[in-house]
Amino acid sequence: MSANAAAKKQKPLKRHPSKLKRMSAYMILTLILISIVAVLFAFPLYWIITGSFKTGAAINATTPEWWPSQWVLTNYQKLFSGKSAPLWQLAVPFGSKFSANGEPIYFSVGPTAPAAIRWMINTVFMAVMSMILTCITAAMAGYALAKKRFVGRKLLFTLIVCAMALPKQVILIPLLREMSSLNLYNTIWAVIFPIVGWPFGVFLMKQFSEGIPTELLEAARIDGASEAKTFIDIVLPMVKPGIGALAIFTFINSWNDYFMQLIMLSSTSNLTISLGIAKLQAENSTDFGLIMAGAALAAVPIIIIFLIFQKYFTKGIAMGAVKG
């Protein structure tokens, strides 16, 4: 009797199949919503790429072709058969100070090439130089703000954080006057130098530098290491993930900074690929195939670079957030 009574008192385990079903339905709904958003974001890129391989009749047809019935390279042939110019023409930084008429000093490299190739070279040079110089200056400034003690350090960091909130339109006129006074206006350097002082880069590298053990720095000083050797041999290896994330971020930001390029550059020889596409659109407002070919040339490389280094970018940003 006691065994039967104990069996009656024992309650069966409760199961929640409905909860599992609700969780499964929630996950399915989430995946559906994410897929819809992904399609909405990816469709314009798909339309540009496929449209660049369509004929003019197919692009202007009343019934759109979701997949080209005939693949042609006519639009890219027109894009790369435009006006010829030296393959690359670069202004010497501050070279106007040494010229007789005060104009920038240029040097040309390579044979003549279509304007689109030159625009692409200008864009790559601008993005790479911005990335290198920003990483160098931000790493040094972030390390100094994190590990050096000097008067006004907190105030300086507060000003940097406040500068991050300022839109580019607010500082546009001072930047324009500064570049003009340095005779850098209408040169590629007028776009590069403002990016080098990017406040976000300093903020990010300071967060990474905060995680460097002070004991390592003190041990290096005791061993007689100079400040430069300590920075190169100890600091840089420990903030490498942050430098990688900042490099990708700066490269993409510089490549896509259409507004600053539009204000600082005017001559055809100094245009970037984004400005070149806008110029093509102004001159060929009805040639949508040519415009799509230029847009694809500008968008596809940066998307590929981001997809390749996306893992390192997100990892670096996450590590910086944790250390900060």
Where are these regions (language model features)?
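A structural signal for multi-pass alpha-helical bundles of membrane permease subunits
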Residues: 18, 26-324
